[in-house]
């Protein structure tokens, strides 16, 4: 992202607030859960009812808690492994709620098949992008980078919603979702390529490991 939208820029705002919340007795995990819950409520109440502008603004505001909990963790000397897993899990939940709210409005508000398809692609690939990296790292492989990551994804989708809602036109959200859909598919391909070209990626697994992976895959 550009310097204007970077974490360093927001740190100037979040660091003092993070220190104040810590002094008040709040924890990073508490802030993570609150921010996610608020984002989910905003996305699933405002987007499906056609309030795209206010939905986009509300989700953007609560998404800032994703930076605030990290600032709190750094201020107290570091985060925990559980906190990292909780943060990543909550990110996936919030992203799913945003796309679910938008796909509902696309289908039943605007009746746009094209927007429904684009939003569903974005919903699926947003989860796959994260899963590829997590699964690769669990296997000792590399899956960093890619064209689109979560901050860029939020900026694109929320900008589309805010402009469509603010000006009462459909094309900003349509454009944003299709741009994001294509970019997300490219990112999945980039990450899979990074995994495949990682050292040891094509080494044969021992029979016991291969059987375990197969069994896990076949579980319901």
Swiss-Prot record:
GO terms for molecular function: magnesium ion binding; phosphotransferase activity, for other substituted phosphate groups. GO terms for biological process: phospholipid biosynthetic process. The chain crosses the membrane at residues 21-46, 52-72, 93-110, 116-134, 154-171, 177-194. Its main location: membrane. The keyword Lipoprotein does not apply. Pathway: Phospholipid metabolism; phosphatidylinositol phosphate biosynthesis. Pfam families: CDP-OH_P_transf. It comes from the Bacteria. It catalyses: a CDP-1,2-diacyl-sn-glycerol + 1D-myo-inositol 3-phosphate = a 1,2-diacyl-sn-glycero-3-phospho-(1D-myo-inositol-3-phosphate) + CMP + H(+); 1,2-di-(9Z-octadecenoyl)-sn-glycero-3-cytidine-5'-diphosphate + 1D-myo-inositol 3-phosphate = 1,2-di-(9Z-octadecenoyl)-sn-glycero-3-phospho-(1D-myo-inositol-3-phosphate) + CMP + H(+). Contains a di-nuclear catalytic Mg(2+) center. It is an enzyme of class 2 (transferase). Mg(2+) 1 binds at residues 66, 69, 87. It is found in: Cell membrane. A CDP-1,2-diacyl-sn-glycerol binds at residues 29-32, 70, 74, 80. The active site is at residue 91. It is a multi-pass membrane protein. The keyword Membrane applies. GO terms for cellular component: plasma membrane. Belongs to the CDP-alcohol phosphatidyltransferase class-I family. Homodimer. HAMAP family: PIP_synthase (MF_02241). Catalyzes the conjugation of the 1'-hydroxyl group of D-myo-inositol-3-phosphate (also named L-myo-inositol-1-phosphate) with a lipid tail of cytidine diphosphate diacylglycerol (CDP-DAG), forming phosphatidylinositol phosphate (PIP) and CMP. PIP is a precursor of phosphatidylinositol (PI) which is an essential lipid for mycobacteria required for formation of their cell wall. This is Phosphatidylinositol phosphate synthase. The lineage of its organism: Bacteria, Bacillati, Actinomycetota, Actinomycetes, Mycobacteriales.
